[in-house]
Amino acid sequence: MSNFFNSLFSDKGEIKGINTQYSVSEIVDILKEEGHSIYLIQDNFWVLKWQGTNVVVVPHDGGDIQFWIMYNDDENRFSLRKVNKMNIDYRVGKFYLTDDEQLGIELLLRNDGNRITKSQIIQGIAALSLLDGLAKKEFW
């Protein structure tokens, strides 16, 4: 590469001057603008609540943003067969069972080298809300 092109890139191969990540406060502001209340903020994650469901939001190095929900259930209503079927039918996120047979939903917004857009964050929350509703319909 010429010196000109080398000057455009950081040592990691990323284009200089383009921020590929949102700060925690920027994502919190986007979620608050959408009417979500954020009630726990740690350095590496925060929790928002909607319709009685806690959603953990984790920003990762590189700009990816992970959303996940865990459901506790003492009645053992979650079956691997149903979870697998939901993963086949709804590929927007991932349903899974933990080792202690609790249901989880994960949705990962991947940074493709550009910045994840505000609309992608809003669509991600909408998709997670849809998956939450499907899980509640299926298991409760």
Each predicted region: which residue ranges?
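Short N-terminal mixed-charge amphipathic segments
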Residues: 46-65, 69-70
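Short amphipathic alpha-helical segments
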Residues: 19, 23-26, 75-79, 120-127
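Well-ordered alpha/beta subsegment
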Residues: 96-126, 130, 136-140
